[in-house]
C-alpha cells in the first residue's frame, strides 16, 4: 500500500534523531559508507531533510501495518533513496544512491 503523504511528520523524525533515538540496518550503513557517509553523516542528512525531499509512504512487504517514509534528498554525491520507519525510534531501513 502506498500514499503520497508522510506517515510520520518530519519534525517528529528530526526530534527523535536529535535525541539519539535512531538506529540503522546493516545494509543501509554499508550503502551509506559507499557514499562516504558514516552513521553521524546519515543522521545529518535526516536532520537536513525538507518537506520537498519527501517521495512517498509505503507499507512493508511483511507487515502492512508498518509504514515506511521514503525521501529522496540531493547530496553532493547525487540523489539518495532514504527509507525510514518510526515505531519507538527512527530506523533507517535504506540509504542508497538513487
Swiss-Prot record:
One of its GO terms (cellular component) is toxin-antitoxin complex. Disruption phenotype: No loss of ability to form persister cells in MG1655, represses persister cell formation in BW25113. Deletion decreases biofilm formation in LB medium. Deletion has also been shown to increase biofilm formation. Deletion at 48h, in flow cells, leads to a reduction in biomass, substratum coverage and changes the biofilm architecture from a 54 micron thick film with microcolonies to one with nearly no biomass and only a few colonies remaining. Deletion abolishes motility. GO terms for biological process: mRNA destabilization; negative regulation of DNA-templated transcription; negative regulation of translation; quorum sensing; regulation of cell motility; regulation of DNA-templated transcription; regulation of mRNA stability; single-species biofilm formation. Changing residue 56 to A: Loss of toxicity. Changing residue 96 to A: Loss of toxicity. Disulfide bonds: none annotated. GO terms for molecular function: RNA endonuclease activity; RNA endonuclease activity, producing 3'-phosphomonoesters. Changing residue 68 to A: Loss of toxicity. It comes from the Bacteria. Changing residue 72 to A: No change in toxicity. Toxic component of a type II toxin-antitoxin (TA) system. Plays a significant role in the control of biofilm formation and induction of persister cells in the presence of antibiotics. An mRNA interferase which has been reported to be translation-independent. It has also been reported to be translation-dependent. Cleavage has been reported to occur on either side of G in the sequence GCU. Also reported to cleave after C in GC(A/U) sequences. Initially reported to act as a cotranscription factor with MqsA. Following further experiments, the MqsR-MqsA complex does not bind DNA and all reported data are actually due to a small fraction of free MqsA alone binding DNA. Addition of MqsR to a preformed MqsA-promoter DNA complex causes dissociation of the MqsA-DNA complex, probably causing derepression of MqsA-repressed transcripts. Does not bind DNA in the presence or absence of MqsA. This is mRNA interferase toxin MqsR. The gene is mqsR.
